[in-house]
Amino acid sequence: EVYKRQSRTVAKAAALLRENAGKVLAANALDLEAMDADSPMRDRLRLTAERIASIAADMESVAGLPSPQGETIAEWTRPNGMTLRKVRVPFGVVGMVCEARPNVTADIFALCVKTGNACVLKGGSDARHSNEAIAALLHEALGAEGIDENTFTLLPAGHEAVGALLSAVGYVDVVIPRGGAGLI
């Protein structure tokens, strides 16, 4: 069943993140090295073994949730006898723009895969190495379950990618900015 495969994919990604924490931490060290030591973004960017374990646990929690797809959230009958229902369905392609928070890469993957959506992520350039390392594991999890790896796409660093994402009308169904007012 599709819903079980989505849950397995998210759980597999969490397991891969735990198993490959060293690789992710090494990539994160490159990002931290390139960032100004006094930057207020530094703590948001920093990953530790504990933070990776927490990210994986959050992904496992999402994997364990029931699928919202197909759930009827409201139903009523009109005076003419016609029954109407509000049913949860995937958006389609979710675009996400975020700052230097590599944990968001895993979060958005888990939420999108679990809900049957594809995701295009534009992460902060400060987290480029971390995001690439995490994305490689997410792609591995997708492949392990026979899901097209393009279900999750990490855009290259740079402001041009944001413009391309925002102008992808007809290809991207919703864009969610996550960050401070300067991002929006």
Locate predicted features.
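Buried hydrophobic positions in well-ordered alpha/beta secondary-structure cores of metabolic enzymes
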Residues: R5-Q6, M59, V94, G116, ...
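Short alpha-helical
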Residues: K23, N103, H129, E160, ...
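N-terminal Rossmann-like NAD(P)+-binding subdomain of aldehyde/semialdehyde dehydrogenases
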Residues: E1-K86, L111
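Conserved NAD(P)+-binding/catalytic subdomain of aldehyde/semialdehyde dehydrogenases
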Residues: V93, I147-I184
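Conserved small-residue-rich beta-alpha loop and adjacent elements
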Residues: S61-G64, P68-E145, V172
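Short beta->alpha junction loops/turns
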Residues: T48, E99-R101, G124, G158, ...
